[in-house]
Regions:
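Conserved catalytic core of the tyrosine transesterase superfamily
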Residues: 1-344
Length: 344
């Protein structure tokens, strides 16, 4: 849900904060919407714990309907550090959130409380000493080259009115290694077919240019032939991917599309694969199949730290075997042995 279309459902101070990070701090709109959702979950939790009798028969559907308009600054003043820890425990047990997801939600409310204290709307920041959970470094799931081709083949050969759009989406994920928010945010003006380039707005509103291969460029051009035309007065006029309602496609929409495409290609055998897995797949294939330099992959992915890129570069056992067999020391020993035989 967009924070812009929900302002009448929010307390004024929350709207001020969301506008501040969007228009002053220049966060991407998709990032602000994610932060808004994180804060909204926390506000609903506050209301639920304050009115335990009203919400004793807890259901997820009931939780989603809790209005946050009446969360006052006085209620926020009552928030203590132990309540933040209890909230994180709630996220873990009730929402089954991973450490990574809990940390993201904690980061959202930490920054919110920091702003509230900095602007003198609150006298105390209860999150200041709350620590982030330790995240186990697990290798993300990914598809093989053959499986990637199978996914694209099944997607383009599906009889659906959105087949061409869906194919372009999956093609971009696998070839350009984009984050979900980056794909959703692509505008028509970001694409230059004559230069085969795509301008991406990534985390922290940072922009980067990536190059399109022929397959990806063709998939986008084919989609543009069937993409609905919007009037220039429409706020989504410039959006590349549109939903059936002729609005900029949402993150959830893309997730559902990818889930359906994966199901068609693999039934339920790839139920652990999601949109971020496709980004990971693209980076892994670049490294293993095309021998792409890790520094190049870092630029394509938009990572600031090389350590963030390293998790995307699986080296297969076969590849490792080839490297070890072809290592410099091995070849020197072989040459030496060969020369000794010649002398004999």
């Amino acid at each position: 849900m967009s924070f812009l279309s929900s302002q009448d459902k929010n307390p004024d101070y929350l709207n001020f904060y969301l506008k501040y990070i969007r228009y002053i701090s220049l966060y991407a709109e998709t990032t602000v919407n994610e932060i808004y959702n994180d804060i909204r979950i926390f506000f609903r939790y506050l209301i639920m714990t304050k009115n335990k009798d009203a919400y004793k028969d807890f259901t997820m559907e009931m939780f989603k309907e809790i209005p946050i308009k009446d969360v006052t600054i006085s209620m926020l003043e009552e928030v203590k550090p132990y309540m933040i820890n209890e909230y994180l425990y709630f996220l873990r047990c009730t929402f089954n959130n991973s450490a990574k997801t809990r940390n993201r939600k904690l980061s959202s409310i930490k920054n919110f409380f920091k702003y509230m204290e900095k602007t003198n709307l609150l006298s105390f920041n209860p999150t200041i000493h709350i620590e982030f959970a330790k995240e186990g470094k697990r290798l993300p799931k990914h598809l093989t080259l053959l499986e990637s081709k199978q996914l694209l083949s099944k997607t383009i050969n599906t009889s659906s009115r959105n087949t061409i759009r869906d194919y372009a989406i999956e093609c971009i994920f696998l070839n350009c290694c984009l984050r979900l928010s980056e794909l959703v945010g692509i505008n028509l003006t970001d694409i230059k077919f004559d230069e085969q380039t795509l301008k991406i707005t990534g985390k922290g509103n940072k922009q980067r240019i990536i190059y399109l291969n022929d397959a990806t460029s063709e998939s986008i051009q084919e989609y543009l032939k069937v993409r609905p035309t919007l009037p220039k007065t429409n706020k989504d006029y410039n959006a590349l991917f549109l939903s059936e309602r002729k609005k900029r496609i949402s993150r959830r929409n893309v997730q559902v599309i990818t889930e359906k495409c994966l199901k068609k290609a693999f039934n339920d055998s790839k139920d652990k694969i999601h949109t971020h897995s496709l980004r990971h797949t693209g980076a892994t294939l670049m490294h293993n199949e095309n021998n792409a330099n890790i520094l190049i992959i870092q630029k394509i992915l938009g990572h600031e730290q090389l350590s963030s890129t390293e998790i995307y570069t699986h080296v297969t056992n076969q590849k490792m075997k080839e490297i070890m067999n072809n290592c410099t020391i091995s070849s020197i020993l072989e040459k030496r042995e060969a020369s000794s035989n010649e002398e004999k």
